[in-house]
UniProtKB/Swiss-Prot annotation:
GO terms for molecular function: asparaginyl-tRNA synthase (glutamine-hydrolyzing) activity; ATP binding; glutaminyl-tRNA synthase (glutamine-hydrolyzing) activity. Belongs to the GatC family. It catalyses: L-glutamyl-tRNA(Gln) + L-glutamine + ATP + H2O = L-glutaminyl-tRNA(Gln) + L-glutamate + ADP + phosphate + H(+); L-aspartyl-tRNA(Asn) + L-glutamine + ATP + H2O = L-asparaginyl-tRNA(Asn) + L-glutamate + ADP + phosphate + 2 H(+). Keywords: ATP-binding, Ligase, Nucleotide-binding, Protein biosynthesis. Allows the formation of correctly charged Asn-tRNA(Asn) or Gln-tRNA(Gln) through the transamidation of misacylated Asp-tRNA(Asn) or Glu-tRNA(Gln) in organisms which lack either or both of asparaginyl-tRNA or glutaminyl-tRNA synthetases. The reaction takes place in the presence of glutamine and ATP through an activated phospho-Asp-tRNA(Asn) or phospho-Glu-tRNA(Gln). Heterotrimer of A, B and C subunits. Pfam families: GatC. InterPro entries: Asp/Glu-ADT_sf_sub_c, GatC. Its EC number is 6.3.5.-. GO terms for biological process: glutaminyl-tRNAGln biosynthesis via transamidation; regulation of translational fidelity; translation. This is Aspartyl/glutamyl-tRNA(Asn/Gln) amidotransferase subunit C. NCBIfam families: gatC (TIGR00135).
Length: 102
């Protein structure tokens, strides 16, 4: 699948990226390169290959040092207020962020 210039303009508009017409050719080439790599990956036969939880688990001699998922500090109203003091805007104990999807 190859993208044309209109496809690139549409993708830029949907992603809310300002892409001047003189840069569309370069973006088109880069996106088409990425799509080509994806097509090559999809062509690889993975039948019978056991899924990995982590890429390093394919090597038996490597031990992963993953930390335990444990609470490291207790949540308190004072701690919440301290963290929210760093936020540009907050409401009802939550961070407010700009809307990114129209």
């Amino acid at each position: 699948m190859a993208l044309n210039e209109q496809d690139v303009a549409r993708i830029a508009r949907l992603a809310l990226i300002e892409l001047p017409p003189d840069q569309r050719g370069r973006a088109q080439a880069e996106l088409n390169g990425i799509l080509h790599l994806i097509e090559r990956l999809q062509a690889v036969d993975t039948q019978g290959v056991e899924p990995l939880a982590h890429p390093l688990s394919a090597h038996e001699d490597i031990t992963l040092r993953l930390r335990e998922d444990a609470v490291s500090e207790q949540a308190t109203e004072a701690r919440r207020a301290e963290l929210l003091a760093n936020a540009p805007e907050s409401a009802d104990g939550l961070f407010l962020v700009p809307k990114v999807i129209e």
